[in-house]
Amino acid sequence: MFKLVRAKGIVRIPPEYFGQSVDEIAIKILRQEYQEKLIKDIGVVLGIVNAKASEEGFIIFGDGATYHEVEFDMLVYTPIIHEVIEGEVSQVDNYGVYVNMGPVDGLVHISQITDDNLKFDSNRGILIGEKSKKSIQKGDRVRAMIISASMSSGRLPRIALTMKQPYLGKIEWINQEIAKASK
């Protein structure tokens, strides 16, 4: 789920930025500090939308920079359990497929793709169903549900997905299900 999060903090503005807009410099520094990083219990910071820094700062003895209180908005992505996502298969391995969900990739374990037994064809980089002959490969559009997310600071979240429930899976399979149900 994407959301805007308002935060408060202190931003250090080095002397080379003195004389410039405090808000613009604060945004630049906050982007360097937070963008594309994971903040525990908040999510992956995709961008700093705006910032309002106090015009008056304070200094610390021995440091030429000024420190300003700042309030800013971050666009973040937080994976939510049972959230249904659509994405593109970015990688296929013998243990499952990785789905690009935008800011992060999620893993669909081979046991969570379909009820059919899947075999990995390493020459073509494709998973093929033994009975159904359904296949999934890099570039396929899929719909999946988040079943777990492990978020620890400093690295991107590990997200487990499933495609076994009705109307989840490769978009082509879903369209076939809908066509069969409407007959």
Swiss-Prot record:
UniProt KW Ribosomal protein keyword: no
InterPro entries: NA-bd_OB-fold, RNA_pol_Rpb7-like_N_sf, RNAP_E/RPC8, RNApol_Rpo7, Rpb7-like, Rpb7-like_N, S1_domain
Residues forming coiled coils: none
Enzyme nomenclature, EC number: 2.7.7.6
Keywords (A to Z) from UniProt: Cytoplasm, DNA-directed RNA polymerase, Nucleotidyltransferase, Transcription, Transferase
Location of the S1 motif domain: 82-164
Domain of life (superkingdom): Archaea
The family this protein is said to belong to: Belongs to the eukaryotic RPB7/RPC8 RNA polymerase subunit family.
Protein's name in the database: DNA-directed RNA polymerase subunit Rpo7
Lineage, highest ranks first: Archaea, Thermoproteota, Thermoprotei, Sulfolobales, Sulfolobaceae
